[in-house]
Structures are given as structure tokens and as C-alpha cells.
Regions:
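Short acidic/polar hinge/loop motifs at secondary-structure boundaries
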Residues: 23-51
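Transmembrane beta-strands of outer-membrane beta-barrel pores
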Residues: 85-89, 119-123, 180-184, 237, ...
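Outer-membrane beta-barrel signature, preferentially recognizing the C-terminal barrel domain
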Residues: 208-228, 408, 412-421, 470, ...
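N-terminal periplasmic accessory domains that precede
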Residues: 3-6, 18, 32-37, 49, ...
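Flexible glycine-rich, low-complexity coil/linker segments exposed to the extracellular/periplasmic environment
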Residues: 271-300, 354-412
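Extracytoplasmic beta-strand/coil segments of soluble accessory domains associated
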Residues: 1-23
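Transmembrane beta-barrel wall of Gram-negative outer-membrane proteins
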Residues: 92-194, 224-231, 235-238, 477-479
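Transmembrane beta-strands of outer-membrane beta-barrel proteins
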Residues: 79-81, 111-115, 174-176, 231, ...
Length: 542
């Protein structure tokens, strides 16, 4: 269930993730990170991790590169089926896992295929307490924000992969690899918050339900998809070996009809026991409450639509030839055309008959108090408006609700285009019987075109920026020495220069002006990539 991979202990954005050697686009909105939990483990044959990058590898991986290799065509008929189950303590529901792999070779072993499918359904959840601590003027600590949360999540994964290859003769081969992954997360969250809790124990109580529409199980649906399709070939052209490939990849994230309903009761008083700092407890004083009732008022009712897509079109050519008996030269070029779009639409709704709406909402509540609450059973999450009620609301009925678009939520929308053109040369030579050297140079040119948004909280307006263009070039040398004085000892010494391109939110030419907070956030499309000099020494003794 780990989400992002880390190499060398660097942040995830400093490493790259690829499938069969091709970078995967990111379904995240503001960053380039790829969620590894999108791809089930049973779809992967091998995981390759490279820390010292060679010139024939993409240069944007300071920490290193993680390459997920899908299953290749087998040498003979293969059939494998997997089924599994489990039980989740929080959701009190069973989990299911199914997998099927089949492959064979035909036409005198010239044609091979391997097809795999995987399905996982995992109802899960979590119990959560969160506290924000502050100090008063006398240096005394107190809790400023106090939250009790319950999550119920059903994660469903579907994954399909296909590998084909056809060998014309010993010098010519063509292959295809494709993978499609779909992950649906249906999430409901029930949260009680003591907002702005003072050192004297006074706070506003907020009670919130996170839900969705009936067609999405009355839950917030997050649907992430990735797909990668690559056609390649291996050919012998005289003294040259030619490898080529052309591919298309796409990643997307959809969050349709994500709804929140939030109620508030102002200025309640609490006795806050912080003698146990890991499990502080706030108890309402007599006459005060943190349980949803008709004393509360509607704070907000919102709905959000989110659509994020990233697409890559890729071409690569590699040529290799021998330079004498103990050396070879490899060189090639690669082109990637990337487009990315982030679109969010956000509305606040106000019931025209707020008193009648409150009565109806309070008639559709559910008690989430749970003796199995893992942090401690002393925390009582309380009563919430049910997810079914939130999902059933016809928010577009103008006779029931008025609506207002929230411009601040649209400020992060953008459209981006990146074109990366790369060329490299790599020499591999054996200096002696015990020493091998690999080294070369990679050149990458990055051209950008971005359109963002400008938001001003004084006028409550959002407008598109003019397209901003920029480009930069990186020269990335690398070398690796390998010394093998005997069969049981190997010493490697490597150096390479690599980069990490800025996250999207940093280079989109947007502007977010918050005059009330005296803050302004500005994207800088002229930002260049972060560069790094990497040195590696590795010794192995068997």
C-alpha cells in the first residue's frame, strides 16, 4: 500500500518511475510523482532500481530510477491462477484478490504472447485523532485544533497487461507491451473538530460528513487510471544493432461530485485534559456539547468536480556497434511530447429554506461512536448526517438551493505542454581482464508552454494567463568503473549528473493574491531543473 517510492533517501519527486523502460505520466495535479500502488504486484515480473544513471537512461532521476518490468512471453505454455481473501478489522468486511496469467508460443516459436489480469477489492478504513498544539504568551502549551476522524474506504483495483513478440529471423524481431490499470477509491469520512480551541477551553464545534452521489455509492470516488502501450523492434543493420520503440501513455484522476456538509456550533466550553500528551481528551462542560443537534447551524455545503489528465507520446531509437574486440559504442535519441491539464470546478450551496433543511438533515443521522476506536475507546466520534442523505440532495434544483462558484478553488487550474528532446553517446570498454569502464554524455532539451490562472481575493475573479514559454538544456555526463580482482569480489565507482524538473505548481504562470493575509503566490515558468552531482562507491564480496 506504499504510495510513493524513495531512492537514496531523497524525496519521491527526485526519482523516476517507468514501466518497461518508459516513464509513466503522473495522475497527481501539482507534482510529477507516480503512485506505485496503482499497479498490483502480481502484474510485475521484475523491479529494476538504478542509482548510477548511464547516458542511455532518462536524466531526470536524482535519487534513481525505478523500472517495473511486466511479464514477458514465456518459452512454453504457462497458466497461473491466484485467489486470496482476508478480513479487515475496521470495515468488518472480507477482502478479495484474483489473478490470472496465460501465455504460449506458436508458429515454430516465432510468435509469443503473455496476458495477465488482476482484480482486488479491499474494504478498509481507519480511526484517527489529530491535534495541533500552540503556546500562549506565558509559554504554556495547549491544543488549538482537536479532531476525531473515521474513514471508511473501499479500494478496488483492476489491471490488465499484454505482451506480444514475433521473431522474423535471428536479426529481426518486433514486440508490443501494454498495461492498463484502474483504481477506484470510495471514501467516506466523519470528522468532529474543535476549531480555534483556546487555552481557556473555548472552541467552535464543527461536524462534517464527506460523501458523494448515489451512482458513486454515496462516497467520494477517486478514480485513477494509467495506461502505457509501446511498440518496439530489434533489428540488425550491418555492423549496427538497432532498437526502436514508439509509445503512448496516459494517466488520469477523476473526482466527480465530491460533497461535504459541515455544521457549526459556536463558543462551546471544554475541560481539556492534556496529562497524556499522546491521548489528550476534551470533555464538554455542563450545558455545552459537541454532539450534532438542532443547536447547530449549517456552516457549508459544497460540491467539487476534479479532472486531471497527463498524456505522453514517445519515440526512441538506439544504435549499437562494436569497437574492436573489447569495446562497444551505443548512441541514440529520444523525443517525448507531454500534455497535462488540471480542471477543478467548485460550488457552495445554500438551502433557500435553511430551517426546513436543518430539520430534514437531523432526521437522517447516524451514530459513528465505536467501541473499537483504535487510538482509544474514550474518543466518541458522535452523530453525523448520513452519507445517503448527502448523496440524495438535488443540488442543481434552483427551487431548493442557490449556488455560488468559489473562484479561489479554481486558481490552481492550468494547461501545460512539455517537449523533451534527448540525444546521447555511451562507450563500454574492458580496459583489462579485471577493469571495465562505461561512460558518456547525454543532452536533454526541455521546451515548455504553460497557461495558468490569476486569482484576486479582492475582486473574487479568476482569469487565464497568457501562454508562457521557456526552454533549457542540460548536459549530463556519467561514468562507471568496475573492478573484479577475483570471482568473489567486485568494486564499482560511479559518477553521474542528473536533474529533477520542477513540480507543475511551481512553474505554472499563475498568481494567487490574498490581500487579507498579505500573501501572494506566483508561479515561475522560467525555473530550470534542479541539478545534482552523484558519486557512488559499491563493494560486494561473496
Amino acid at each position: 500500500e506504499a504510495r510513493f517510492g524513495q531512492v537514496r533517501g531523497t524525496p519521491p519527486e527526485f526519482s523516476s518511475v517507468s514501466v518497461n523502460g518508459s516513464r509513466i505520466p503522473s495522475a497527481e495535479g501539482d507534482i510529477r510523482n507516480v503512485q506505485l500502488d496503482l499497479i498490483p504486484a502480481d502484474m510485475i515480473q521484475t523491479i529494476e532500481v538504478n542509482k548510477t544513471l548511464m547516458p542511455d537512461q532518462d536524466g531526470d532521476a536524482i535519487g534513481g530510477s525505478i523500472n517495473l518490468v511486466t511479464k514477458n512471453s514465456p518459452r512454453r505454455f504457462t497458466l497461473n491462477a491466484v485467489a486470496g481473501s482476508g478480513f479487515n478489522w475496521v470495515s468488518r468486511k472480507a477482502q478479495m484478490n484474483f489473478g490470472l496469467t496465460v501465455g504460449n508460443r506458436f508458429f515454430n516459436d516465432r510468435f509469443g504472447f503473455m496476458a495477465s489480469a488482476s482484480f482486488q477489492n479491499a474494504p478498509a478504513g481507519s480511526y484517527d485523532t489529530e491535534f495541533l498544539w500552540e503556546k500562549d504568551d506565558d509559554g504554556k502549551v495547549y491544543i488549538n485544533d482537536y479532531q476525531i476522524r473515521q474513514y471508511y474506504v473501499t479500494r478496488q483495483r483492476q489491471s490488465y497487461s499484454l505482451s506480444l513478440d514475433y521473431t522474423f529471423n535471428e536479426h529481426n524481431k518486433i514486440w508490443f507491451k501494454g498495461i492498463f490499470n484502474n483504481r477506484n477509491d470510495w471514501e467516506n469520512r466523519y470528522r468532529t473538530t474543535l476549531k480555534g480551541l483556546t487555552a481557556k477551553g473555548v472552541a467552535d464545534v464543527r461536524v462534517q460528513t464527506k460523501a458523494g452521489t448515489p451512482d458513486n455509492r454515496n462516497a467520494r470516488l477517486e478514480r485513477q487510471r494509467t495506461m502505457d502501450f509501446t511498440l518496439g523492434g530489434e533489428n540488425r543493420l550491418g555492423i549496427f544493432s538497432l532498437d526502436w520503440k514508439i509509445g503512448y501513455a496516459r494517466a488520469s484522476e477523476e473526482r466527480p461530485n465530491e460533497r461535504y456538509i459541515d455544521f457549526r456550533l459556536k463558543k462551546q466550553k471544554f475541560d481539556v485534559d492534556i496529562s497524556d500528551e499522546r491521548q489528550p481528551l476534551a470533555s464538554p462542560l455542563e450545558g455545552y456539547t459537541m454532539t450534532l443537534s438542532d443547536r447547530f447551524s449549517l456552516k457549508e455545503l459544497t460540491e467539487q468536480q476534479e479532472d486531471i489528465t497527463e498524456q505522453d507520446f514517445k519515440m526512441a531509437v538506439d544504435l549499437k556497434t562494436k569497437l574492436g574486440k573489447s569495446a562497444s559504442l551505443k548512441f541514440g535519441a529520444k523525443f517525448v511530447n507531454k500534455t497535462k491539464r488540471k480542471d477543478i470546478d467548485f460550488y457552495e450551496y445554500t438551502p433557500l429554506d435553511e430551517k426546513g433543511f436543518m430539520s430534514e438533515a437531523l432526521a437522517h443521522t447516524v451514530d459513528q461512536t465505536n467501541s473499537r476506536f483504535m487510538p482509544s475507546d474514550k474518543y466518541k466520534d458522535g452523530t453525523f448526517v448520513s452519507k445517503e442523505f448527502v448523496g440524495s440532495l438535488n443540488l442543481n434544483d434552483q427551487s431548493i438551493f442557490s449556488r455560488d462558484q468559489v473562484p479561489a478553488e479554481l486558481a490552481g487550474n492550468y494547461h501545460a505542454r512539455e517537449a523533451v528532446t534527448a540525444a546521447y553517446a555511451l562507450v563500454d570498454t574492458r580496459i583489462s581482464d579485471h577493469i571495465q569502464f562505461m561512460g558518456g554524455l547525454r543532452l536533454e532539451n526541455t521546451a515548455l508552454k504553460y497557461t495558468g490562472r490569476i486569482y484576486d481575493d479582492e475582486t473574487e475573479t479568476v482569469s487565464k494567463t497568457e501562454p508562457a514559454k521557456s526552454s533549457y538544456v542540460n548536459f549530463l555526463p556519467s561514468m562507471l568503473f568496475k573492478w573484479e580482482p577475483g570471482k568473489d569480489f567486485t568494486l564499482r565507482v560511479g559518477y553521474n549528473q542528473s536533474i529533477s524538473r520542477p513540480k507543475y505548481s511551481a512553474i505554472v504562470p499563475g498568481m494567487n493574491i490574498s490581500r487579507g493575509d498579505n500573501e501572494i503566490k506566483i508561479g515561475n515558468p522560467k525555473l530550470s531543473a534542479t541539478s545534482s552531482h552523484n558519486f557512488d562507491i559499491n563493494a560486494e564480496h561473496y
